[in-house]
Amino acid sequence: MPDCPRPSPRTRDAADAAGPRGGAPRLATVADVDGMHRVRLAVRENRLSDPGRITAADYRAALETLGRGWVIEAQGQIVAFAIAYASGSLWALFVDPAHEGRGHGRALHAAMVEWLWSLGLRRLWLTTAPGSRAEGFYRRLGWQACGRIDGDLRMELPREA
C-alpha cells in the first residue's frame, strides 16, 4: 500500500473548541459490550447485513487483548463508542443516531488517537465505505485516502513531526 500524502495542518473549528456536548469518553469494559452492540446496530450507515457477524467475543477480544475502547454515556445509557487496536487500526467508531451532532465522534476520535500516539506509532489506519459520511468525518480530521481493501477505502493518519 503506498504512503499517503502528508495532510495539511487542520485548524480548530468551533466544535473542537467547545468539546463534546454531553458526557466525556471513558474507558470501556466488557460490561459495556451489550450497550456498544446496541449502538452498532442502531446506526444508519455502515449497517451490518448480518447482526451476528460481530459477536460479544469480538468486542471482548478487542477490549481485553487487541486494543482499547471508549464509551460516552447519556442518562446511564451508552450512546457512542470507539475501539482501536494497539497495532494502529481504528476498528470502530459509532454514535447512536439520536445523539449525533453533539461532538461525541470527535471526542472518541481524540481519545483513540491520543492513546495510539502514546504507543509510539507513526501512522494509523482504518477502512470505511467510500463516499460515506464516515469518510467525510475522517477527512475533516486529517485522514488521507490511500487505496482500497475489499472495496472499502483505506485511510491513514500519519503522526505529525
Each model region followed by its residue ranges:
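Conserved active-site tyrosine of GNAT-family acetyltransferases
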Residues: 138, 143
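Conserved beta-strand-loop-alpha-helix junction that forms the acyl-donor binding cleft
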Residues: 125-135, 151-156
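Conserved acetyl-CoA pyrophosphate-binding loop and the N-cap/start of the following alpha-helix
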Residues: 99, 103-111
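Conserved GNAT-fold acetyl-CoA-binding loop/helix
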Residues: 33, 37-67
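Conserved beta-strand in the GNAT
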Residues: 71, 77-94
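A short, internal acetyl-CoA/4′-phosphopantetheine-binding micro-motif in the GNAT/acyltransferase core
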Residues: 93-101, 128
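A short beta-loop-alpha structural element at the N-terminal edge
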Residues: 23-38, 146
